[in-house]
Amino acid sequence: MDDASASAGYSHRHMERKMSAMACTVFNELRLEGKLCDVIIKVNGALFTSSWNNSEKRVYNIPGITPDMMKLIIEYAYTRTVPITVDNVERLLVAADQFNVMGIVRACSDFMKCQLCLENCIGICKFTEYYYCPELRQAAYMFILHNFEEMVKASTEFLELSVNEFKDIIEKDELNVKQEDAVFEAILKWIGHDPPNRKQHMAVLLPKVRLALMHAEYFMNNVKMHDYVKDSEECKPIVIDALKAMYDLNMNGPSSSDFTNPLTRPRLPYAILFAIGGWSGGSPTNAIETYDARADRWVNVTCQQESPRAYHGAAYLKGYVYIIGGFDSVDYFNSVKRFEPVKKTWHQVAPMHSRRCYVSVTVLENFIYAMGGFDGYVRLNTAERYEPETNQWTLIAPMHEQRSDASATTLYGKVYICGGFNGNECLFTAEVYDAKVDQWSLIAPMRSRRSGIGVIAYGEHVYAVGGFDGANRLRSAEAYNPVANTWRTIPTMFNPRSNFGIEVVDDLLFVVGGFNGFTTTFNVECYDEKTDEWYDAHDMSIYRSALSCCVVPGLPNVGEYAARRDNFVGSTPRDEVKYSSSTSTLPV
């Protein structure tokens, strides 16, 4: 093949047709020798035949196709392979669609899917309006929705959208924008490309913005006072409705009507936070909740067939959520399960070399790393990594210290692990792993000892949050600068916690559940590095510690894990919580 990005698709087709691979070769050789051929195809004066026995064969003129494309189609008919390149893919798809050669159409569609980028996604989407390639159309359209903010900045094709095409994009729940300001700014850019002919469309486009979700100051200064809005009589009732909706939201909080009102309806999240398993009510739980950051709501998606697990690790890689190691109050696990969120199926994969409870897990360059932990006898300094393609775990260099109940993350191509418990004391040390040389190095120690810690890369720093210092559960947090090799303190959380989940969603650092020194908790809060402040988020429905979190982006069925837009309910009262609070925890 001429392009590496398409090679996987073609090798798959060869495997599907193994029975005919040799037959295809034989028939093509016969064609080239003029045997078993009874017609000649003529395209723009070019004859598709051999030099043998041409005099008695019927000639067919084929209009509307170039000789080079017909040559590829004929060769595909005999060989079931076709060279697809950036230069020929569109013309080849058009020709294949004309002659209903669906194998080539699918191959070209797969190739173009791999070529989708900010600059060409709109062009490819519009191209699919004329030819039957529904999967390519869906992929291109979702690429536009998922990368809207970046696409608006990079694409010149965006400026050529019709008003209806633009309106259809910005009204979608799947539009991936963190703030509605970005949608309004996109409208201004689109109108600004041709103001005399486009400013009249502001009244059509403005209601598609979730105006009541904007910051009031931005709305008043940038939307209400903009000339395109002020000069439109049709925009005035839209502005009034938005102000009323903003007032109701601020005074009364979220209500069931918010999801039916187009001005207050949250977009669907691009990424879903999964909170998996943990320790609840004095025993491990199999509970799984997902967090919809755009609606600030949790959804219970527990699969009752799954066994309980606590003090495990969770990681997302290439379409799967992996649950690694852990403890069920009897056994310490080396087993690993993976969950496919699209099909909602669970499968066992290869086990680790060691049993690991209190394990630290992270992902780096298509490998899952599992480090330290407790095997039921000793705290571990060993580490290993998993490669999904081979379904194998491989031991890597051991850490400098034994660490259970530590936490790990990746930043700038390296693995960082911080804190933990070595069997004698809570640790303030931290290490970094360089996979290129398979080597661990100690970095500057944290300012506090932290076992049951949460560690996450956020912005340009590694954050170490909460934990247990040997005497108290901690509210404090600190950030590591890898360039300066220094730690600095950041504002404290509202609540002390250890053994909690930690992740970054929509540029906010979330801490989920945990143990506060007296009880397991369902409390959630988030930190914004831009404001250097913590904020309360909606509580989980289940009290638990020893859970693990991971973030799953770009799900095609995201609505199944997000708050339902067609049946939204407001805040869940705490007396409806399904699991009671418990002071029981597994001893460190």
Predicted regions and their residues:
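Cytosolic, low-complexity regulatory segments enriched in Ser/Pro/Gly with interspersed Lys/Arg
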Residues: 1-22, 574-581, 588
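Charged, flexible boundary elements
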Residues: 14-36, 252-261
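Generic recognition of well-structured, leucine-rich alpha-helical segments
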Residues: 30, 76, 80, 96-102, ...
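Canonical BTB/POZ domain core
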Residues: 33-120, 145, 160-196
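Amphipathic alpha-helical interface elements that mediate macromolecular binding in regulatory proteins
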Residues: 67-71, 75, 87-90, 102, ...
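Eukaryotic adaptor/scaffold assembly regions
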Residues: 122, 126-131, 135-266
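Kelch-like beta-propeller repeat domains
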Residues: 200-588
